[in-house]
């Protein structure tokens, strides 16, 4: 059971204020190719980039290991934290009150 309830409007604003390209770029180096951003996946070892970030759709996906999701999911995986902590991190970045 989650400790906190986040109204859908607040959660949507959190994701809107945290552009996925900006957040992912704060952890790894992305290279733009066309409409996508590419990098070697931070979640498995690889030599050829298979990790993509789609700014328009605000999601990420790795064609190598299959991991993917939205900005909250990315922070959960990078920080090895739960959803509550990821939301707290993103709210702080966006200057939003919890």
Question: For the regions a protein language model found, what residue spans apply to each?
Answer:
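N-terminal structured subdomain of primase-like DNA metabolism proteins
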Residues: 1-98
């Amino acid at each position: 059971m989650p400790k906190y309830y986040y109204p859908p409007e607040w959660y949507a604003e959190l994701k809107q204020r945290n552009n996925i390209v900006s957040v992912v770029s704060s952890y790894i180096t992305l290279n733009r190719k066309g409409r996508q951003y590419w990098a070697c996946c931070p979640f498995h070892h690889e030599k050829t980039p298979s990790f993509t970030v789609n700014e328009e759709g605000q999601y990420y996906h790795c064609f190598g290991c299959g991991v993917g999701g939205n900005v909250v999911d990315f922070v959960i995986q990078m920080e090895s934290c739960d959803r509550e902590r990821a939301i707290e991190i993103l709210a702080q970045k966006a200057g939003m009150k919890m």
